[in-house]
C-alpha cells in the first residue's frame, strides 16, 4: 500500500511531534533529577542536632518516654525536683532516677520544691539551688546543669549568682534555639559572646546561665494545638537551626523541653506516647544527632558555648 503525499506529510509531522515530546519528557526527568541532587547537596553541609529535656521528673517520663528513647538509641536530660522522688504521687522514685543515671541519661536540678525563684530570699535560694545539688549527690548524681521552674529567675542577678556557685550551665525557655555565641538576639542584645555580666556588672541577656529552650507542652497549652499541629510545630522548631548552621558548623541548637508523657490526669500540658514516638521517628529518619545538656559546655577563654 502506497501513502499519498498528504499521508506522508502527516506521518512526518507525527514523527516530529513524538520526537519533541520524548525529548521534552527526557529533559524534564533530567531537570528533576538535577534539582533533587542540588537539594541534597544544598542540605548536605547542614549538620542537624537537637537536645532533649524533661522537666519535673514525672513517672511517665520513665515508663512511657524512656522506652521510646531507648528504641531509637537516644538520651535526654531529666531535670528533677529533688523532694518529689518517693514523696509525691505521679513522680519517679529514686530507684528509677538512679537507673536513668546508670544507663547514661543526664540528670540535672530543678530545685528542691519547684519554687519560683524570682522573689526568693537568699536563704531560700541556697536551699532550692545549692541543697538540691547536694540532694542529688547523695544518690550518686553529679548535676552540672540547672533548670529554672516557671521560666523565672534567669534575669535576676541575685538568683544567677547562687546558680553559678553550684552549676556549669542553667536553662530557661522562650526560644526555639539557643545560640552558641550568644550573638543571635539582635532585638534583645548586641552582645557577641556569652559572658555572664556586662562591663558595668549587669547580667547579659544571653549567657551560660540563661540557655534557652522551647517548651513543647507550653506551646500546646498556649496555642491549643492538636497532636498533628504540635507535630508540625515540632518539625518547624527543630529545623529552625538550618539558617544558622552551614557547612557543618553548629551555631544554633534547638532544645526541646517536655514535661508529662502520657499522664491521664493532664490534658493540655502533656505529650502522648504516640506523638512522642512520631517526633523521635522524625529525628531518626532525618539524621538528627540527639544530645543532652551534658554535651554542652562553656569555654572560659572565648566566652562561648560549644559541643563536647
Identify the meaning behind each predicted range.
Residues 39-63, 258-260:
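Boundary/entry segment of secreted carbohydrate-active catalytic domains
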Residues 48-50, 70-193, 204-217, 250-263, ...:
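Metal-dependent polysaccharide deacetylase catalytic core of the NodB/CE4 family, i.e.
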Residues 214-291:
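Catalytic grooves of carbohydrate-active enzymes
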Residues 2-16:
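N-terminal Sec-pathway targeting helices
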Residues 15-26:
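Hydrophobic membrane-insertion alpha-helices, especially the h-region
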Residues 24-41:
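Sec-dependent signal peptide cleavage junction
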Residues 62, 93, 125, 129, ...:
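Aromatic/hydrophobic pocket-lining residues that form the small-molecule binding cavity
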Amino acid at each position: 500500500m502506497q501513502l499519498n503525499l498528504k499521508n506522508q506529510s502527516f506521518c512526518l509531522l507525527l514523527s516530529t511531534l513524538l520526537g519533541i515530546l520524548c525529548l521534552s519528557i527526557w529533559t524534564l526527568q533530567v531537570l528533576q533529577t538535577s534539582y533533587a541532587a542540588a537539594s541534597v547537596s544544598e542540605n548536605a553541609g547542614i549538620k542537624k542536632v537537637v537536645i532533649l529535656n524533661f522537666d519535673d521528673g514525672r513517672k511517665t517520663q520513665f515508663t512511657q518516654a524512656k522506652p521510646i528513647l531507648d528504641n531509637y538509641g537516644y538520651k535526654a536530660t531529666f531535670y528533677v525536683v529533688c523532694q518529689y522522688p518517693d514523696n509525691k504521687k505521679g513522680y519517679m522514685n529514686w530507684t528509677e532516677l538512679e537507673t536513668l543515671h546508670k544507663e547514661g541519661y543526664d540528670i540535672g536540678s530543678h530545685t528542691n520544691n519547684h519554687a519560683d525563684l524570682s522573689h526568693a530570699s537568699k536563704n531560700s535560694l541556697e536551699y532550692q539551688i545549692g541543697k538540691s545539688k547536694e540532694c542529688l549527690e547523695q544518690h550518686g548524681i553529679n548535676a552540672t546543669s540547672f533548670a529554672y521552674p516557671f521560666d523565672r529567675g534567669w534575669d535576676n542577678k541575685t538568683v544567677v549568682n547562687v546558680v553559678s556557685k553550684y552549676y556549669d550551665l542553667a536553662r530557661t525557655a522562650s526560644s526555639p534555639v539557643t545560640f552558641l555565641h550568644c550573638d543571635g538576639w539582635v532585638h534583645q542584645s548586641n552582645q557577641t559572646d556569652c559572658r555572664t555580666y556586662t562591663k558595668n556588672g549587669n547580667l547579659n541577656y544571653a549567657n551560660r546561665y540563661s540557655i534557652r529552650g522551647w517548651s513543647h507542652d507550653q506551646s500546646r497549652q498556649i496555642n491549643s494545638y492538636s497532636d498533628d499541629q504540635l507535630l508540625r510545630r515540632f518539625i518547624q522548631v527543630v529545623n529552625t537551626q538550618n539558617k544558622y548552621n552551614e557547612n557543618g558548623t553548629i551555631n544554633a541548637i534547638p532544645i526541646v523541653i517536655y514535661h508529662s508523657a502520657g499522664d491521664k490526669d493532664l490534658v493540655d500540658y502533656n505529650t502522648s506516647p504516640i506523638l512522642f514516638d512520631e517526633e523521635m521517628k522524625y529525628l531518626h529518619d532525618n539524621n538528627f544527632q540527639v544530645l543532652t545538656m551534658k554535651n554542652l559546655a562553656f569555654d572560659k577563654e572565648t566566652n562561648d558555648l560549644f559541643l563536647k
